[in-house]
Amino acid sequence: MAMLLYADSKFTSPYVMSVFVALTEKKLPFKIQTVDLDIGANNDPDYALISLTQRVPTLIDGNFALSESSAIVEYLDEAFPDPPMFPSDRQRRARARQVQAWLRSDFLPIRLERPTPTIFYQRPVSTPLSAAAQAASRKLCAGASELLGHGGDNLCGDWSIADVDLALMLNRLIVNGDQVPLALVRYAKAQWERPSVQGWVRRERLPL
Ligand SMILES: N[C@@H](CCC(=O)N[C@@H](CS)C(=O)NCC(=O)O)C(=O)O
């Protein structure tokens, strides 16, 4: 039976994107059910019965419902190991998970001032970054440059889902014309060309 992915109706959630990419990479059959976050449909009692967090993404696999994007991707990776979403080497895998957790728990000023509709609806903003967002941007670029200092195409050797998450965060800055080192721009661009990522980027979207 096809799995069901609950997604935001405008397809701008970076967390839904991460799960979409994992399902697509693994060529798993799945359907998408949209939830209109603009009207708070995620707080409807019916959705709360399905989604413990009342957020998207939530994945339904048979009678099992799971929220939190990184938990979903790890679940998929254990249930359907091929192709893997994380490096096989333990320390590289830990690094990929660290990056995922870091991107989800930090960089709030960037997320607020450079929201994902600026990427997926190609509507860059002209407001300069606040001092807090500039500091977050410096931290992000320093960390990403350090992680990619090996000169390879991916964060942790082989491609992993953390590359998608990092490219998304960098693109928040890049598409809005904020300063990002050229090596990171090239990295984000290459990651963005991945067919599974393009499958999300090119989705038909409702008007903003
Ligand atoms: N940590 C969660 C974050 C999920 C999240 O923040 N989803 C947003 C959309 S991007 C949402 O559902 N917002 C609605 C709300 O919180 O009311 C994950 O990784 O899945």
Residue spans for each PLM region:
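Phosphate-coordinating loops and pocket residues in cytosolic domains that bind phosphorylated ligands
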Residues: 49, 193, 202
